[in-house]
């Protein structure tokens, strides 16, 4: 059986291959949703309702799957600035005391929280109280009825675990030819789909317990257009190419074919109709906003160096855990060369659908 870690965070530290220096693709998406996030809070957050039954003057915010780097701090600051704006505009008495903010930064236990808090802007330390919350967001990580605004971006495609059958040699769902779910093998896709549905149910169920009545959950990320396999997107092409590089390394004895067959990424990009169905299935929330948004970088080709650096920052930890030390450098050196020889044809590749969703706890 595979030796996947229980958690698979982005590459830590602040070196050249770290996520902190290779997350601009995600930053552009966050910046693109910034105005919509503010509009959603101004329209849907009821400050009086949130604290009607509370003696506290603290508004709690959580960023789930925060990783490291500036993106999470920018998200949180935008939320706080908007709440302050709303509070001032409404001249809200808000329990008669100055409004304070507590921010919970959540990610897997082996996320690099040291780097996260070491790089926290000084100004933010004066604006809110910070707490690191290690744990999978597929389960409850905060006390019941304690959260006012939850946020998650570009993280829900990570599953809680690799579907068991895709690494079972006796199963028809064995993902023998690929290291991802690229939707080309139906048995593999179905195994991933089942795991995704369970994880989405667990995620929304946990947030329903944590959020107070009237609290908001803001989600953004990517889905596949209905009927389009991931293999036809540029992201799918990239990961399949990384898998090809691993097979080349196996032929030269650097790793083994068996190890590759037992390696499959715990990532599932659902089709937009699948994702919408799972959101609607949970009856604890009302859907205030559900819309498609554009990613500014979808309309221009990315450089090979950019692609290599981004995917190394994302996949470094899980590849190293499964294949051992020394494989990652060789793998991404080979990948960079293969990418230069066979560059991505962005005009032919299908594009992901970017979504922005606002849920309100009933």
From Swiss-Prot:
Gene Ontology terms for molecular function: metal ion binding; methyltransferase activity
Amino-acid positions noted as binding Mg(2+) in the UniProt annotation, renumbered to this chain: 175, 261, 263
Highest taxon above the source species: Eukaryota
DNA-binding is among the record's keywords: no
Keywords linked to the UniProt accession: Magnesium, Metal-binding, Methyltransferase, S-adenosyl-L-methionine, Transferase
Pfam families xref list: Methyltransf_7 (PF03492)
Cofactor(s) in the UniProt record: Mg(2+)
InterPro entries per record: MeTrfase_7, MeTrfase_capping, SAM-dependent_MTases_sf
Enzyme class: transferase
Enzyme Commission number: 2.1.1.-
SUPFAM superfamilies according to UniProt: S-adenosyl-L-methionine-dependent methyltransferases (SSF53335)
Co-factor: note: Binds 1 Mg(2+) ion per subunit.
Subunit structure: Homodimer.
UniProt record similarity statement: Belongs to the methyltransferase superfamily. Type-7 methyltransferase family.
Protein name: Probable S-adenosylmethionine-dependent methyltransferase At5g37990
Organism: Arabidopsis thaliana (Mouse-ear cress)
């Amino acid at each position: 059986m595979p030796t996947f870690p229980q958690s698979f965070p982005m590459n830590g530290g602040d070196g050249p291959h770290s996520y902190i220096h290779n997350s601009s693709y995600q930053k552009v998406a966050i910046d693109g949703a910034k105005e919509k996030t503010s509009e959603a809070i101004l329209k849907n957050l009821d400050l009086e309702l949130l604290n009607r039954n509370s003696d506290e003057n603290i508004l709690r915010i959580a960023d789930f799957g925060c990783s490291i780097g500036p993106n999470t701090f920018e998200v949180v600051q935008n939320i706080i600035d908007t709440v302050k704006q709303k509070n001032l505009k409404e001249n809200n008495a808000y329990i008669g005391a100055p409004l304070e903010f507590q921010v919970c930064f959540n990610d897997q236990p082996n996320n690099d929280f040291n780097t996260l808090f070491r790089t926290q802007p000084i100004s933010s330390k004066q604006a809110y109280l910070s707490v690191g919350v290690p744990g999978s967001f597929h389960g409850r990580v905060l006390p019941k009825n304690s959260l006012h605004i939850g946020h998650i971006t570009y993280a829900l495609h990570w599953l809680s675990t690799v579907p068991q059958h895709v690494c079972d040699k006796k199963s028809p769902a064995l993902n023998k030819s690929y290291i991802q779910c690229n939707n080309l093998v139906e048995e593999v896709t179905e195994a991933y789909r089942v795991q995704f549905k369970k994880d989405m149910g667990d995620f929304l169920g946990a947030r329903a317990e944590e959020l107070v009545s009237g609290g908001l959950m803001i989600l953004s990320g990517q889905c596949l257009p209905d009927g389009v396999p991931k293999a036809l997107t540029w992201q799918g092409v990239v990961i399949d190419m990384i898998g090809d590089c691993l097979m080349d390394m196996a032929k030269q004895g650097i790793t083994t074919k068996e190890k590759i067959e037992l390696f499959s990424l715990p990532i599932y990009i659902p089709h937009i109709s699948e994702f919408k169905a799972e959101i609607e299935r949970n009856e604890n929330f009302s859907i205030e906003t559900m819309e498609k948004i554009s990613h500014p970088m979808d309309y221009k080709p990315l450089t090979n160096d950019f692609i290599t650096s981004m995917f190394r920052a994302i996949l470094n930890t899980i590849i190293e855990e499964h294949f051992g030390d020394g494989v990652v450098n060789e793998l991404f050196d080979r990948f960079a060369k293969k990418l230069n020889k066979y560059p991505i044809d962005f005009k032919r590749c299908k594009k992901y659908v970017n979504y922005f969703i606002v849920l309100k706890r009933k």
